């Protein structure tokens, strides 16, 4: 929260970037008694929030880490935005997976994997629509900074693809670890 005091990007931009993560924490806290989440998911939420806070402090297009990579590897743009969208697939995938396993009769099979990927892609697409709406509604630089396309006409498509790939890659690799973490949480509701 200290990054909200005087973010380089300005408070409005910071709130737009970090607000959804803070809302996610509020929702997780509100439903904790009915739907206790695993330690794995809490770590995912924390790591995702760190990425959001860092990007929100500077704006994703101006993060020092992204600028360093841009200079070091000769990239045409700051790719921290891409890291953020990859994270939009990686970390929420486990939240979605856990909720589906706890609140539905889905088995741990291909349908679960497919549905988690569908929800991740839907969230990524909604985020792209949200970026567009904010650009239309919020004045000048803040709206453009939130959009973060950096002149790439395919930015929205890349962002959605990266979220989908992030989820598609981590789910098979870490599903068993996630299952072990869920097994240590009593099932309620």
State where each predicted segment sits:
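Lipid-exposed faces of alpha-helical membrane segments in multi-pass integral membrane proteins
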Residues: 2, 19-26, 43-54, 118, ...
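Membrane-interfacial alpha-helical segments at the cytosolic side of multi-pass membrane proteins
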Residues: 23-32, 87-104, 136-142, 161-177
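Internal alpha-helical transmembrane segments of multi-pass membrane proteins
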Residues: 104-121
């Amino acid at each position: 929260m200290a990054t909200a005091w005087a973010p380089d990007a300005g408070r409005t931009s910071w709130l737009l970037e970090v607000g959804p993560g803070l809302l996610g924490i509020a929702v997780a806290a509100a439903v904790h008694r009915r739907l206790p989440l695993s330690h794995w998911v809490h770590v995912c939420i924390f790591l995702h929030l760190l990425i959001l806070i860092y990007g929100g402090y500077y704006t994703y297009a101006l993060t020092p880490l992204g600028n360093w990579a841009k200079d070091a590897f000769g990239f045409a743009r700051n790719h921290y935005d891409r890291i953020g969208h990859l994270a939009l697939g990686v970390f929420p995938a486990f939240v979605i997976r856990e909720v589906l396993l706890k609140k539905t009769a889905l088995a741990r099979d291909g349908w679960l994997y497919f549905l988690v990927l569908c929800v991740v892609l839907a969230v990524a697409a909604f985020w792209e629509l949200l970026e567009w709406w904010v650009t239309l509604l919020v004045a000048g630089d803040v709206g453009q900074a939130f959009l973060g396309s950096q002149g790439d006409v395919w930015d929205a498509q890349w962002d959605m693809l990266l979220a989908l790939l992030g989820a598609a890659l981590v789910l098979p690799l870490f599903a068993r670890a996630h299952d072990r973490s869920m097994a240590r949480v009593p099932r309620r509701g």
